[in-house]
């Protein structure tokens, strides 16, 4: 969904700490993540872009929990937390009660190993713009999963121009969270 937890749009930066373990395991600083609408979010178009972001940091769950910048993303600080796996002394994690994910999601969430931080992100919402087919970046077979593509500098510049030209969601119905387009 685009409920605000995956990714989490709250300041100081957009973060992806839950769901999408494959992306979180592989992404590196400088990578672009494009998120397409799922069937529940937008049943009419599987190629609409809900959000996009450029990875600026890759943190472990322990680093994320201990980083003061992200205290505001813990369960007692927001309605849509994503910072709810507290490190334990045996190198594991203790799930913290939250309204987003139950304890049954812990293996999937922490299996992604990393938390991605995006200082530069675009939020388009559930009915975001359709990614032009000629970019060659659409999900081909289904709406689930992930795929990687290497872009040349001209391809990336063209995509960035397109992303910057799209209207952003600035206020969501779940509160006054604003997009973090910088």
Task: Mark where each language-model region is.
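Structured loops at beta-to-helix junctions and adjacent beta-edge loops in soluble globular domains
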Residues: 1, 36, 56, 121, ...
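Short N-terminal edge-element motif at the start of the domain
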Residues: 1-45
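Eukaryotic short linear interaction motifs
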Residues: 42-43, 58-63
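A generic structural signal for short, solvent-exposed coil/turn residues
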Residues: 45-47, 116
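Short beta-strand-centered aromatic/proline hotspots
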Residues: 47-58
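Contiguous surface segments at macromolecular interaction interfaces
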Residues: 61-182
């Amino acid at each position: 969904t685009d409920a605000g937890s995956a990714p989490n749009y709250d300041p100081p930066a957009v973060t992806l700490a839950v769901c999408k373990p494959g992306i979180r395991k592989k992404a590196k600083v400088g990578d672009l993540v494009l998120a397409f609408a799922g069937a529940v979010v937008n049943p009419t178009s599987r190629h609409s872009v809900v959000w996009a972001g450029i990875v600026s940091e890759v943190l472990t769950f322990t680093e994320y929990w201990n980083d003061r910048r992200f205290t505001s993303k813990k369960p007692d600080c927001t309605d849509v937390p994503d910072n709810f796996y507290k490190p334990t002394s045996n190198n594991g994690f203790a799930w913290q009660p939250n309204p987003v994910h139950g304890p049954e999601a812990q293996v999937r969430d922490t299996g992604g190993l990393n938390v991605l931080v995006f200082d530069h992100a675009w939020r388009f919402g559930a009915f975001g713009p359709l990614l032009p087919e000629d970019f060659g970046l659409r999900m081909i077979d289904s709406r689930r999963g992930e795929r990687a593509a290497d872009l040349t500098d001209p391809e990336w510049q063209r995509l960035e121009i397109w992303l910057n030209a799209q209207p952003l969601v600035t206020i969501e119905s779940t509160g006054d969270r604003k997009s973090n387009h910088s």
